UniProtKB/Swiss-Prot annotation:
SMART domains: BRCT, LIGANc. InterPro entries: BRCT_dom (IPR001357), BRCT_dom_sf (IPR036420), DisA/LigA_HHH (IPR041663), DNA_ligase (IPR001679), DNA_ligase_AS (IPR018239), DNA_ligase_CS (IPR033136), DNAligase_adenylation (IPR013839), DNAligase_N (IPR013840). The keyword RNA-binding does not apply. Belongs to the NAD-dependent DNA ligase family. LigA subfamily. Residues 607-691 form the BRCT domain. Coiled coil: none annotated. Zn(2+) binds at residues 418, 421, 437, 443. It catalyses: NAD(+) + (deoxyribonucleotide)n-3'-hydroxyl + 5'-phospho-(deoxyribonucleotide)m = (deoxyribonucleotide)n+m + AMP + beta-nicotinamide D-nucleotide. Pfam families: BRCT, DNA_ligase_aden, DNA_ligase_OB, DNA_ligase_ZBD, HHH_2, Nlig-Ia. PANTHER family: CHROMOSOME TRANSMISSION FIDELITY FACTOR 18 (PTHR23389), DNA LIGASE (PTHR23389:SF9). It comes from the Bacteria. Monomer. This is DNA ligase A.
Length: 691
């Protein structure tokens, strides 16, 4: 129970959490979806740590859709077909100091004693890729995505010279039936420089750094473009494997090399923390001797059995950590400070600087966050400023070189009106550091982002309606807001250059858009909820609400307490839902969609038996035949509740590979635990299958 003082500060804590979670999510969007981050790794890590600390102090704020519970790009639209990983593809926790590394090693020692050895490998600054081989043949390649579902980039991956089409069998290591191997796609520095030189010759903009160029090259729609770019890959881990059970990660790497897969030459074993520190210190001094960019050293427990014992959190394994090196710094001239309006109305100032080389790439722009941060840093327009690239990747302004001032510098004045729509700017609540544009309905900047969100993969997943299409529709005044999307006609689309051919006819993409909009009208209710851009409502909360209430009208009519009582929702999301439906123009959007034929009820397939009616089931770990979303939808379709946490009310826990803490909680509470076969029997026959 919270103290009286805590109760009094609860509203302020909630506001602080909402602002922080929103800021983290916006930066995740810019990093994973746009490939155009505006803050440094260090700044993002600090934001995430502040959010984690706040949720640690107030666990009731931690929702399934919180950025602390999600991996990478969860919840954002992508350009390629979604595919499920056979086993979760997690991120890594970071250590920035010797003390943080020692604390991690201490936790390992407390759990497994002196039994662990440590594998040290370079942290390549590239793009994560997962390869699946069946009977030795490459059948799929996919990006990390949200850790469970990634983008299918198989055709592009096949153009990478390091990726074999078939594995080479060996006497010591027979090729396994199924092999899911993880690695990093990157550019060697000389290949990156050659690519940028060719782009400049063609009159195109060069890439800012090798990581961005690797991401852009891997995501080309035309594999021939990818093939012309000299991408490389190094493997650094396993996912789901059938027919091969290595005792150590070191042994797994030997097998990968024997099969013809690329493995780093710079991987070493250490017996203790002192050996780990020696490797970290060595590469800290010699990092620029490597032919590709690195931003640290990854340290992993080598023994596979100990890895299983240590388990993982919802986003990262406990048996591995990435030690990141201190950033590099440079000086340059701050030419101007300009502001940008984000999708939630937050006004962000940006530093525009004389381009300068830092850590191997050219930097000319960086975020300054807000007016308070500019004041804290003490920077003036015209200053010589110190910039750094945390993790050798993303730039940040540290502060001015005061002794170089000549009196011509001037103070930056935050605008009082929105640069997009001219509305007066103000903090949303007293005490907020950020100022916002309150014109949520009419601000072009916010409107563009909302239209884009409607079509996102976790929204209504409407192909063709990407960012460019949304901008074209708004600029041509074909739509006034997202409410008019589903009333679009061929005549409307012909008013835009984007969807009109030179002959004045509707383009192929225009025809596809109309077909896809019509298909989206029949989307499940939870997708409609996500598409409405209700703050904090992601797929998990949307599914829970759709299952509990069955229709959008019932959700709108529910009280905040009723909404909060739904498992997976809680008070923060409930308050956001109530506030959203209290706004007149929000309800107008719902009415427009309803009039256009968008389905507002959660229709159930009557042919599916309700074998799980009244049961609460938790799924943990990776299942072979189900993605996490598939398993949840199978439970809900049969009348059950797919919960996110284990409690005394839980009827069954379904445990796949690497189940984590939910498995331990089930054992502690005596909740029945099913493997995947048991889960299939439960779906088919209900609890009777357990007797």
């Amino acid at each position: 129970m919270s103290s009286p003082d805590a109760d009094q500060t609860a509203p302020e804590v909630l506001r602080q959490w909402q602002a922080l979670a929103e800021e983290v999510r916006e930066h995740q969007f810019r990093y994973y979806v746009r490939d155009a981050p505006i803050i440094s790794d260090a700044e993002f890590d600090e934001l995430l740590r502040r959010l984690e600390a706040l949720e640690e102090q107030h666990p009731e704020l931690r929702t399934p859709d919180s950025p602390t519970q999600l991996v990478g790009g969860a919840g954002f639209a992508t350009d390629f077909e979604p595919v499920d990983h056979l086993e979760r593809m997690l991120s890594l926790d970071n250590a920035f100091t010797a003390d943080e590394l020692a604390a991690w090693a201490g936790r390992i020692h407390a759990e497994v004693g002196d039994a662990a050895h440590y594998l040290c490998e370079l942290k390549i600054d590239g793009v994560a890729l997962s390869l699946v081989y069946r009977e030795g043949r490459l059948t799929r390649a996919s990006t990390r995505g949200d850790g469970r579902t990634g983008e299918d980039v198989t055709l592009n991956a096949r153009t990478i010279a390091d990726v074999p089409e078939r594995l080479t069998p060996g006497d010591d290591y027979p090729v396994p039936e199924v092999l899911e191997v993880r690695g990093e796609v990157f550019f060697r520095l000389d290949d990156f420089q050659a690519l940028n030189a060719s782009l400049v010759e063609e009159g195109k903009a060069p890439f800012a750094n090798p990581r961005n160029s690797a991401a852009g090259s891997l995501r080309q729609k035309d594999p021939a473009v990818t093939a012309r770019r000299r991408l490389r890959m190094i493997c650094h881990g396993l996912g789901h494997v059938e027919g091969f059970r290595p005792a150590t990660l070191h042994q797994a790497y030997l097998a990968l090399r024997a099969w013809g897969l690329p493995v780093s030459e710079h991987t070493t074993l250490a017996t203790d923390l002192a050996g780990v520190r020696e490797r970290i210190d060595y590469w800290g001094e010699h990092r620029h001797e490597v032919d590709h960019e690195i931003d640290g050293v990854v340290v992993k427990v080598d023994e596979v059995a100990l890895q299983r014992r240590l388990g993982s959190t919802s986003r990262a394994p406990r048996w591995a950590i990435a030690y990141k090196y201190p950033p590099e710094e440079a000086q340059t001239k701050l030419l101007d400070i300009r502001v940008n309006v984000g999708r939630t109305g937050r006004i962000t100032p940006f530093a525009f600087m004389t381009p300068v080389k830092v850590a191997g790439s050219t930097v000319g722009q960086a975020t300054l966050h807000n007016a308070s941060e500019i004041k804290r840093k003490g920077v003036l327009i015209g200053d010589t400023v110190v910039i750094r690239k945390a993790g050798d990747v993303i730039p940040e302004v540290l502060g001015p070189v005061v002794e170089l001032r000549d009196g011509s510098e001037r103070e930056f004045i935050m605008p009082t009106t929105c640069p997009e729509c001219g509305s007066p700017l103000a903090p949303e609540k007293e005490g907020d550091a950020d100022i916002r544009c309150p014109n949520a309905r009419g601000c072009p900047g916010q409107l563009r982002e909302r239209v884009f969100h409607v079509a996102s993969r976790n929204g209504l997943d409407i192909e063709v309606l990407g960012y460019e299409a949304g901008v074209a529709l708004l600029q041509a005044k074909v739509i006034a807001d997202e409410g008019e999307l589903f009333a679009l006609t061929e005549r409307d689309l012909l008013r835009t250059d984007l969807f009109r051919t030179k002959a004045g006819e509707l383009s192929a993409n225009g025809k596809r858009l109309l077909v896809n909009l019509d298909k989206a009208k029949a989307a499940p209710l939870w997708r409609v909820l996500v598409a409405l851009s209700i703050r904090h409502v992601g797929p998990t909360a949307a599914r829970a609400l759709a299952t509990e209430f069955g229709s959008l009208d019932a959700i709108a009519a529910a009280s905040t307490d009723q909404l909060a009582a739904v498992e997976g929702v809680g008070p923060t999301i409930a308050a956001a839902v109530t506030e959203w439906f209290a706004v007149d123009w929000h309800r107008e959007i719902v009415d427009k969609w309803r009039a256009a034929g968008v389905r507002m009820v959660d229709e159930r397939d009557e042919s599916v038996p309700r074998t799980l009616a009244g049961l609460t089931i938790v799924v943990t770990g990776s299942l072979t035949g189900f993605s996490r979303d598939d398993a949840k939808e199978a439970i809900v379709a049969r009348g059950g509740k797919a919960a996110g946490s284990v409690s005394k009310k839980t009827n069954y826990v379904v445990a796949g590979d690497s189940p984590g803490s939910k498995y331990d909680k089930a054992v502690e509470l005596g909740v029945p635990i099913l493997d995947e076969d048991g889960f299939r029997r439960l779906l088919a026959d209900g609890p009777a299958s357990r007797t």
